[in-house]
Amino acid sequence: MYDWLNALPKAELHLHLEGSLEPELLFALAERNRIALPWDDVETLRKAYAFNNLQEFLDLYYRGADVLRTEQDFYDLTWAYLLRCKAQNVVHTEPFFDPQTHTDRGIPFEVVLAGITGALKDGKSKLGVDSGLILSFLRHLSQEEAEKTLDQALPFRDAFVAVGLDSSEMGHPPSKFQRVFDRARNEGFLTVAHAGEEGPPEYIWEALDLLKIQRIDHGVRAIEDERLMQRIIDEQIPLTVCPLSNTKLCVFDDMAQHNILDMLERGVKVTVNSDDPAYFGGYVTENFHALYTHLGMTEDQAKRLAQNSLDARLVKP
């Protein structure tokens, strides 16, 4: 079944480039940039990938991202991910990147962007993988900081298809970022946002009504609010769900409890994605395979999930 799932044409709509930094590449970049790491070797680092919640993961994620310093580093990171896409028949990807993670460390915005977009261009020409880049604001920082990031992005507006919102969800509701999302939309950007991963259904309502998003990233807690579920079904608002991430971060205690197939059967346009695959133990095919192994996903359900991902692209073919 793994090979069949791997061969299925699919899109990935919820992937953080910084979260695809595999331990081997992390160590190679640290050596290249002469950065001391707190881990002795790759295996020690892998053992650190045990998280009780989103914040524990984020602490390690930001520590790992510190090895990304040069345009070549960002190219290598993105290219390694695109090779995974090619190997798993991900024909289209819409990855996030977090400029603030890097500009706050003194890395110029244009250096980050040049490395990523250079790789995405080569991914199209050399691998046949289409893409659209999403600039994501960090919600644990202020709206004013997000607006500065938007200002930095405007000279490069053609490089992005959308703006998004990620990082620590609890205590940082979408309403905190209404003004910057209004500005982004006025500048012609589409909008998406993480909501309803650890946060309550109210955060999803806010993302829809205040940020006017095209797609909900995560959204698994929508099932707790029947009126919200009905709206998502009626309006066919896509959800970019990340099963392995949800279990690694204890959103669900184990995969057998995951609600993605329940949502699919109720008519929700759910999709399967890997989120931060280097940290959560699998890329898109591994996420599909986990649903087959633990939830008994059928071939028909897998085809519908894959088709949903292709239908939910912001960049249309």
From Swiss-Prot:
Q: Please report which protein family the annotation says this sequence is part of.
A: Belongs to the metallo-dependent hydrolases superfamily. Adenosine and AMP deaminases family. Adenine deaminase type 2 subfamily.
State what protein this is by name: Adenine deaminase
**Documented EC number(s):** 3.5.4.2
Any idea which positions bind Zn(2+)?
H14, H16, H194, D275
Q: Name one Pfam family in it.
A: A_deaminase
InterPro entries from the xrefs? A_deaminase_dom, ADE, Ado/ade_deaminase, Metal_Hydrolase
One of the GO biological process terms? hypoxanthine salvage
Which residues participate directly in catalysis? E197
Which reaction(s) does its UniProt entry say it catalyses? adenine + H2O + H(+) = hypoxanthine + NH4(+)
Q: Which organism is it from?
A: Pseudomonas syringae pv. syringae (strain B728a)
* Keyword line: Hydrolase, Metal-binding, Nucleotide metabolism, Zinc
The cofactor named in the record is: Zn(2+)
What is written in the cofactor note of this entry?
Answer: Binds 1 zinc ion per subunit.
Which residues of the sequence carry a binding annotation for substrate?
A: D276
What Gene3D superfamilies does the database record attribute to this sequence?
Metal-dependent hydrolases (3.20.20.140)
The cellular component terms of Gene Ontology attached to this UniProt record, alphabetical and capped at eight, are: cytosol
PANTHER family under this entry?
ADENINE DEAMINASE (PTHR43114:SF6)
Which residue positions does UniProt flag as site: Important for catalytic activity?
H218
Free-text function comment from the UniProt entry = Catalyzes the hydrolytic deamination of adenine to hypoxanthine. Plays an important role in the purine salvage pathway and in nitrogen catabolism.
Q: Under the GO molecular function aspect, what terms does this record hold?
A: adenine deaminase activity; zinc ion binding
